[in-house]
Amino acid sequence: MAKITVGTENHTPIELYYEDHGMGKPVVLIHGWPLSGRSWEYQVPALVEDGYRVITYDRRGFGNSSQPWNGYDYDTLATDLHLLLEHLDLQNVTLVGFSMGGGEVARYIGTYGTNRVEKAVFAGAVPPFLYKSEDHPEGVLDDAAIQGFENGVKDDRLAFLDEFTKIFFAAGDRTDLVSEPFRLYNKDIAAGASPKGTLDCIGAFSKTDFRGDLAKINIPTLVIHGDSDATVPFEYSGKRTYEAIPNAKVALVKGGPHGLNATHPKEFNEALLSFLKD
């Protein structure tokens, strides 16, 4: 629908693709790794029909946005979000971050505050801190797990994405929560992303510590998570985010995998719309 310039690389503009639909209070939907704004297909119509202005955008390196070599750290990604909000002059925004996108929500608020932001939603999101190390033994992703992800992307990215999307939409033995054409569609979206961006984002979402950012969140916050999320398990992420933010609310979706906004759109949308109306 439109693009904005957020920087340059070798004199070439770095552009973010975004779509802006509906009228009313703005809701900005931030997609997960390694997909695009298309992953909100089941949310955009529901929000627009309920009277909201809905903005989706493709993170740099993904979807229809530019694919620069660098800039996949959360400080840069939060700045990209900041530039989009400024460009559209959005006020009283609800930021909804899914998976990796929850990191942008946290880092944006931690860096830029809440002058433009009214509410925050973390959906299957990576904060507070996934990395497992000697300094943070309660994490879930250790160096070996992260290396496995990175090697998968470097050695055969398409084969990795094929397996990853199977786990993404599966809850335990339930692998029929989305159709095979839908899974393959999402694999194709991921396949079109920047290989370098796909790789660099692994280190960003697995090793970035958002605990300091969450400590600065003083606005109404909702955590939506699937209780069967094998990609970003609730107990290591959403549960801790919920506990870290005063008066946060939580909607734990029974049988929900990581990609619960697609597998359980009714439950996801009901939780989101109820929170928006509070």
Give the positions of each predicted feature.
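Flexible "cap/lid" loop of the alpha/beta hydrolase fold
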Residues: A106-T111, N115-D155
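Conserved acidic catalytic loop of the alpha/beta-hydrolase fold
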Residues: T76-V93
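Conserved alpha/beta-hydrolase "acid-adjacent" motif
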Residues: A230-Y236
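Conserved alpha/beta-hydrolase catalytic His-Asp/Glu region
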Residues: Y131-K132, H136-V140, N151-A215
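Short beta-strand/loop motif that positions the catalytic acidic residue
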Residues: I217, V223-H225, D229
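Catalytic active-site module of serine/aspartate enzymes centered on a nucleophile-bearing elbow/loop
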Residues: A248-D278
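Conserved alpha/beta-hydrolase "nucleophile elbow" surrounding the catalytic nucleophile
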Residues: H31-W33, V93, G97-S99
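Conserved HGGG/HGGXW glycine-rich cap/lid loop of the alpha/beta-hydrolase fold
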Residues: N10-N70
